[in-house]
Amino acid sequence: MSILEKITSSPSECAEHLTNKDSCLSKKIQKELTSFLEKKETLGCDSESCVITHPAVKAYAQQKGLDLSKELETRFKAPGPRNNTGLLTNFNIDETLQRWAIKYTKFFNCPFSMMDFERVHYKFNQVDMVKVYKGEELQYVEGKVVKRPCNTFGCVLNTDFSTGTGKHWVAIFVDMRGDCWSIEYFNSAGNSPPGPVIRWMERVKQQLLKIHHTVKTLAVTNIRHQRSQTECGPYSLFYIRARLDNVSYAHFISARITDEDMYKFRTHLFRIA
């Protein structure tokens, strides 16, 4: 079985919380744009996202007072390097996690962080995990800031400092489901967590031990999965997605997941920009 078969994502450009994948658009927008959608080839388009980002359609929508930006943000996957091995940006990552937070209503999506988060202002270092669990921590979902109880937490970090341009993406996942809670660090290159992450994990562990009897920290780093220079972003997102779909962290320490799997996963992550 392919590793991609263990998760619930698909190559559709529609956001994954939508149950009807025949169209990603709301019924109102479908009706208003029928003439464009039926003749999308004349616009040089082969997808709905292409149609609603076409200059002629955007101009028409503006005249009619239609909010196409909201459609793109809440009903489509994030734009990104879907069919190539382009490096993922923080926007690619955060916009994907925000969309997953619509599908997984108990998932707290934390904005990306650079590795100097202990001295630079990043949400990652300010989050109180007890407040996350109790629904007292603010997060961005469906275009608005909300509070809601969450039993999972995910964030993608870059191993570079904020003064740099970025080096390598890694993942943090906190699982507050079940009897034994876990604070997990995943690095597709197989490297151990650096000091700032170790300190963060221990601090969060002490927070959670105030409300739960068993909490452990895990470094999921015993296998070097990644061999390419481009797939650290997809690997980091894949780890979070697999854990949301209840794939055990043990799967990542028992067998290598290949770069070829991540090339395919890109088609599950993004719509064509």
Swiss-Prot record:
UniProt enzyme class: hydrolase
Keywords: Host cytoplasm, Host-virus interaction, Hydrolase, Inhibition of host innate immune response by virus, Late protein, Protease, Thiol protease, Viral immunoevasion, Virion
Superkingdom, natural source: Viruses
Induction remark: Expressed in the late phase of the viral replicative cycle.
Enzyme Commission (EC) number: 3.4.22.-
The keyword Methyltransferase belongs to this UniProt entry's keyword annotation: no
InterPro entries in the cross-refs: Papain-like_cys_pep_sf, Peptidase_C48_C, VPRT
Binding site for substrate: 226
SUPFAM superfamilies from the UniProt entry: Cysteine proteinases (SSF54001)
GO biological process, one term: viral protein processing
Single GO term (MF): cysteine-type endopeptidase activity
Active site, UniProt feature: 168, 187, 232 (nucleophile)
Family: Belongs to the peptidase C63 family.
The protein's role, per its UniProt record: Cysteine protease that plays several role during infection including processing of the structural polyprotein or inhibition of the host immune response. Catalyzes the maturation of the pp220 and pp62 polyprotein precursors into core-shell proteins. Plays a role in the disruption of host pyroptosis via specific cleavage of gasdermin D/GSDMD. In addition, strongly decreases the host cGAS-STING signaling by targeting IKBKE via its enzymatic activity. Also impairs host FOXJ1-mediated antiviral effect via degradation of FOXJ1. Cleaves host G3BP1 inducing loss of stress granules formation.
Record's protein name: Cysteine protease S273R
